[in-house]
A protein has these predicted regions:
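Flexible, surface-exposed loop/linker segments and immediately adjacent secondary-structure boundaries
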Residues: 20-160, 165-176, 200-202, 208-210, ...
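Cleavable N-terminal signal peptides
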Residues: 9-10, 20
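Low-complexity, repeat-rich tail regions
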Residues: 177-515
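Bacterial N-terminal signal peptides that target proteins for export
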Residues: 1-8
Length: 515
């Protein structure tokens, strides 16, 4: 009997571990800026698709910044900025830290908060480990060009590099250059390129954010809140953020569209530049006719949710789908696979204790008339919902259909009552940068149509040279360096859709010095 009991305990432990493994990621990044065109390679199918702002980024994803473009990814309190014709792969991303890979192109990394597990950047010739918050430059060379030396630079902060020929510690103003054959590690002085200066300006704007006083530094997407709203104290909920650039009649979860994003399923993608944190963390409430966002307790670790709403409606497979933004102390019931621990962590910042969360989680879902924000119910037809159409253009009049006996519309408590995922869960894939799969033979993807409906791209940045300005530092070098001379600036082919517009502008963009 003891043996049987031991086996039962073991099986229970395995089952519990399996339930925990089924939980979706609690920590994500977001595509926060696209100047031009970008693509995302999803972890679940490894296909490249057009990328728009506010799309969540998880471990296993890749991001490609197209020709003539610049792209930014926010990861908690840090940002990775990609120059044109550059790729960044996310190998690890969770509460403990991040591991990134740069197969090709130029990436500027701003680290404001270093997680306990640290942050590493993998390259073709070694590992770049971030030791302190700061700004870092990674240049892996341009796709399709001749082999170049890899440049890793510490603009500010502290890092280390470990490669085939040894390891070296780097301080502010230092970098390493490593040839493709990895025969040496050369320590050099580094200075900001024009791309770094653009990234530094962008980082400076976000660094001045007062929102860090009210939200956790691990909350992805808080950086734009100060630019588009104000924080005000309230007697019942503490600091509340109010958006300042919304139209009359605006309500949360109306300006954007729904996308089927694994592993969560239906995910809200907002149109606003600030529209990430307020729609994936916290709760909304109306204050004298103004909508305000309540972030929750700052000391609680934020857990990402695809949309903090309650879906409401009639029978499964109906013609319409409705939802209501959750208000203060209203429970979010995940409509995707999850464990009990996940539900507690997801709602912890808005309830007094775990027991209260458990009681709400196991209670029957309320009718639509029980929600504090029931006046802000939004409804669209099922086709517009599952087709990713702009919600504000397809809203249907009237609220969700009532339940049996003319009772308030019921809450859709399981995914089976939501519209099924579209047969084709992704947009037409953009040609993928083959260099990621075939090192040494990279080919940039061709320009593709712009992604998110209703999102016009920002003006493309003017091409500018970014030959790294480097000087040897004999006192710290591992091997006697060869003189570093800037390479000639080759003419680079412009994207077809921009040739006429930019034919009078500077023809060359960022290019790596060659040896």
């Amino acid at each position: 009997m003891k043996k049987i009991a031991s086996l039962l305990v073991a099986f229970s432990a395995i089952a519990a571990a399996g339930a925990a493994l089924a939980d979706p990621p609690a920590f994500v990044g977001r595509l926060s800026l696209v100047e031009g065109a970008a693509s995302i390679r999803h972890a679940y199918d490894q296909q490249w698709v057009p990328g728009g702002i506010n799309f969540p980024i998880i471990a296993g994803d890749g991001v490609w910044s197209d020709q003539g473009s610049r792209t930014e990814i926010e990861i908690g309190g840090s940002e990775a900025r990609l120059d044109q014709i550059s790729e960044l792969d996310i190998e690890r991303l969770d509460e403990s830290g991040a591991t990134l890979r740069v197969p090709q192109g130029v990436v500027n990394l701003t680290v404001r908060y270093l997680p306990p597990g640290g942050m590493q950047v993998m390259t073709s010739v070694g590992q770049f480990s971030i030791r302190r918050p700061g700004e870092y430059h990674i240049d892996a060379g341009r796709p399709g060009g001749p082999p170049t030396q890899l440049l890793l630079g510490v603009m500010s902060g502290e890092a280390s590099f470990a490669g085939l020929r040894g390891a070296v510690e780097l301080n502010s103003g230092q970098g390493v250059m490593v040839p493709p054959d990895q025969t040496s590690i050369q320590v050099v002085a580094v200075y900001p390129t024009p791309f770094d200066q653009w990234a530094e300006t962008r980082a400076g704007q976000l660094a001045a954010s007062q929102s860090m006083a009210y939200v956790s530094p691990e909350m992805t997407g808080y950086q734009d809140l100060d630019t588009y709203g104000q924080w005000q104290p309230t007697p019942d909920y503490g600091p509340v953020w109010f958006p300042s650039q919304v139209e009359i009649g605006w309500a949360p979860y109306r300006r954007g569209h729904w996308a089927y994003v694994q592993p969560w399923g239906w995910t809200w993608i907002d149109d606003a530049p600030w529209g990430f944190a307020p729609f994936h963390y916290g709760r909304w409430a109306e204050f004298d006719g103004r909508w305000g966002w309540i972030p929750g307790e700052r000391h609680e670790r934020p857990v990402y949710a695809p949309a903090l709403v309650a879906f409401i409606g009639g029978e499964p497979g109906g013609d319409h789908v409705g939802w209501v933004p959750l208000g203060p102390r209203e429970m979010f019931h995940p409509y995707y696979e999850h464990s009990d621990v996940y539900v507690i962590n997801l709602n912890r910042g808005h309830f007094h204790d775990e027991g209260e969360i458990r009681r709400f989680d196991h209670a029957p879902p309320p009718g639509s008339d029980h929600f504090a924000n029931r006046q802000a119910v939004t409804q669209v037809n099922a086709g517009a919902f599952s087709g990713g159409q702009p919600v504000h253009e397809h809203m249907t009049p009237g609220g969700p259909a009532p339940g049996p006996g003319n009772r308030p519309a019921p809450v859709i408590g399981d995914v089976g009552r939501l519209p099924p995922p579209p047969a084709q869960q992704r947009a037409q894939p953009a040609p993928s940068p083959a260099g990621a799969a075939q090192p040494g033979q990279p080919q940039p993807p061709q320009p593709h149509p712009q992604p998110t409906p209703g999102q016009a791209p920002a003006q493309l940045p003017r091409p500018m040279p970014t030959v790294p300005q480097v000087q040897p530092l004999p006192q710290t070098q591992i091997q006697q360096p060869r003189p570093v001379q800037p390479a000639p600036q080759p003419q680079q082919q412009q994207a077809p859709q921009q040739q006429k517009k930019e034919q009078k502008e500077t023809p060359d963009h960022d290019h790596q010095a060659q040896h």
